[in-house]
Amino acid sequence: MMEFTIKRDYFINQLNDTLKAISPRTTLPILTGIKIDAKENEVILTGSDSEISIEITIPKQVDGEEIVEITETGSVVLPGRFFVDIIKKLPGKEVKLSTNEQFQTLITSGHSEFNLSGLDPDQYPLLPEVSRDDAIQLSVKVLKNIIAQTNFAVSTSETRPVLTGVNWLIQDNELICTATDSHRLAVRKLQLEDESENKNVIIPGKALSELNKIMSDSDEDIDIFFASNQVLFRVGNINFISRLLEGHYPDTTRLFPENYEIKLGINNGDFYHAIDRASLLAREGGNNVIKLSTGNELVELSSTSPEIGTVKEEVNANDVEGGNLKISFNSKYMMDALKAIDNDEVEVEFFGTMKPFILKPKDDDSVTQLILPIRTY
């Protein structure tokens, strides 16, 4: 038996976040549901696909306003997406849920009434246990930046599963996050404020992407706890648990060449938009390839589509060191890298026509983007 009445708008927001952990393709039918657990002073929502689990605690009051009135404690598992769709379409400002001993659930709001067949919550798998010791703490803003600056570079191919995740290495109180799909590499470094144990884990890119969606742009802190095969992110009323990927992440430090041939500074926005325009033809050509040549403090970008025509763009460069160079690259990779650099001025280092090149913010080594060129010249 369970009964409570809750503010509908608040409930919808929390249900939407819980739903992000639920996959229709699960092998366990009960995991397509949301577990609802009404306790004396709070309601807990749980969603899981066995890879990612999200647990959200709804307190009785938020900022002095009553959110939920709990008449009787109890639990039930309700069909996730169907239940959320019902709550979204209900007419009233409040929703009342009550269950009987067979987990039949009555949902009422305004003049609407739904009866849903619930499942026994005791059949719902237990969430992984993650020790609350030895946390690292970041601000939500910083974590969202880390995800934006690395996660796009993970591999989407399952042939090397470790590359579908981001490597988080904690060493000497520095956090180094690395992602690569073998064609490009993104690295973000951060000095940690508190003493932290050394760690080397791989967090699935999909999990970080879902976590990013449910974190609001706030100055809140997020606590991150690691277990042998799980990671827990705790922020506000949300616990987000993800399975870690097994295996050894490749040593990517050897990919960075030494002694650049050419180094130049360039305006991030000008460079990005020029590549964006040139990529219109590159995409039509079917290969996303843009040719770049340097000389006379100019960067020239060009692309050709046999059916449509050609495009040429010029962007001013500054602080140019070295001679001239021609190189070709994937326009999408370059635009992703520039988007990840949160700085108006970008430094680009070239090491040769067929060697990887590096982009980073001017006078800042905390973000590094590496891209492998394409052989066209």
Swiss-Prot record:
GO terms for biological process: DNA strand elongation involved in DNA replication. GO terms for molecular function: 3'-5' exonuclease activity; DNA binding; DNA-directed DNA polymerase activity. Keywords: Cytoplasm, DNA replication, DNA-binding, DNA-directed DNA polymerase, Nucleotidyltransferase, Transferase. SUPFAM superfamilies: DNA clamp (SSF55979). GO terms for cellular component: cytoplasm; DNA polymerase III complex. The keyword Iron does not apply. SMART domains: POL3Bc. It is found in: Cytoplasm. Confers DNA tethering and processivity to DNA polymerases and other proteins. Acts as a clamp, forming a ring around DNA (a reaction catalyzed by the clamp-loading complex) which diffuses in an ATP-independent manner freely and bidirectionally along dsDNA. Initially characterized for its ability to contact the catalytic subunit of DNA polymerase III (Pol III), a complex, multichain enzyme responsible for most of the replicative synthesis in bacteria; Pol III exhibits 3'-5' exonuclease proofreading activity. Belongs to the beta sliding clamp family. Forms a ring-shaped head-to-tail homodimer around DNA which binds and tethers DNA polymerases and other proteins to the DNA. The DNA replisome complex has a single clamp-loading complex (3 tau and 1 each of delta, delta', psi and chi subunits) which binds 3 Pol III cores (1 core on the leading strand and 2 on the lagging strand) each with a beta sliding clamp dimer. Additional proteins in the replisome are other copies of gamma, psi and chi, Ssb, DNA helicase and RNA primase. PANTHER family: BETA SLIDING CLAMP (PTHR30478:SF0), DNA POLYMERASE III SUBUNIT BETA (PTHR30478). This is Beta sliding clamp. It comes from Staphylococcus epidermidis (strain ATCC 35984 / DSM 28319 / BCRC 17069 / CCUG 31568 / BM 3577 / RP62A).
